[in-house]
Structures are given as C-alpha cells and as structure tokens.
Amino acid sequence: MASVSELACIYSALILHDDEVTVTEDKINALIKAAGVNVEPFWPGLFAKALANIDIGSLICNVGAGGGAPAAAAPAGGAAPAGGGAAPAEEKKEEEKKEESEESDDDMGFGLFD
C-alpha cells in the first residue's frame, strides 16, 4: 500500500498534469508544502524523474489495462485463404450474441419459487 508521502507526490503530479504544467521536483514540493504534508525529501525528485518522459494522460487512461493479450497462433496448415476463414466465425459470434440477448429478455429474474 502506498504511504502518505507517495500519495502526496502522486496527487501533486496529477494536479500539475491537470493544470497542464510540467511536473518538476520544485513544483511537487510547492504543492506538498501548500498542503501541509511532511514527506521525505527524496520522494518529489523521484516522482519528477519518473514522470519526466511519460505521458501522464495516457498512463491514466490505461490504468488497469494490464499487459497485452497474447498473440494468436498461426494456423498449422500455413496461411489462411484471403477472407474465407474470418466471415463464418464472425457470423457465428453474431448469432450467439443474438441468441443470448433473446434469452436474457425472456428471463426477468423471477425464479420458479420466488
């Protein structure tokens, strides 16, 4: 779990990003001092250096995205025919989605003995 010092630096960096101001050690220190929080002196510099070359906006948007999905394996028989294999699979998925939506419309959440 993050300490108060870490959270103070994180929130300071987010405030600076929201105001479209460059995140620097001095600016983080100024915000922390204005908030009246006591942090160890190395935290603001550490966060400023860590966020120097990172797009904080994309970092915020991709929180929880985790690692990427593994790449799909190529078919064993070689390359698939152009456009031939993908269309039936898409049609099956669409049919399954339609069936699921029809079933969910019928089930109103009432059980037999409710």
UniProtKB/Swiss-Prot annotation:
GO terms for cellular component: cytosolic large ribosomal subunit. The modification Phosphoserine is found at residues 101, 104. Keywords: Phosphoprotein, Ribonucleoprotein, Ribosomal protein. Residues 89-100 have a biased composition (Basic and acidic residues). One of its GO terms (molecular function) is ribonucleoprotein complex binding. GO terms for biological process: cytoplasmic translation; translational elongation. The keyword Phosphoprotein applies. Pfam families: Ribosomal_60s (PF00428). Gene3D superfamilies: 1.10.10.1410. Residues 68-114 are annotated as: Disordered. InterPro entries: P1/P2_N_sf, Ribosomal_P1/P2. Residues 70-79 have a biased composition (Low complexity). CDD domains: Ribosomal_P1 (cd05831). Heterodimer with RPLP2 at the lateral ribosomal stalk of the large ribosomal subunit. Plays an important role in the elongation step of protein synthesis. HAMAP family: Ribosomal_L12_arch. Belongs to the eukaryotic ribosomal protein P1/P2 family. This is Large ribosomal subunit protein P1. The lineage of its organism: Eukaryota, Metazoa, Chordata, Craniata, Vertebrata. The gene is RPLP1.
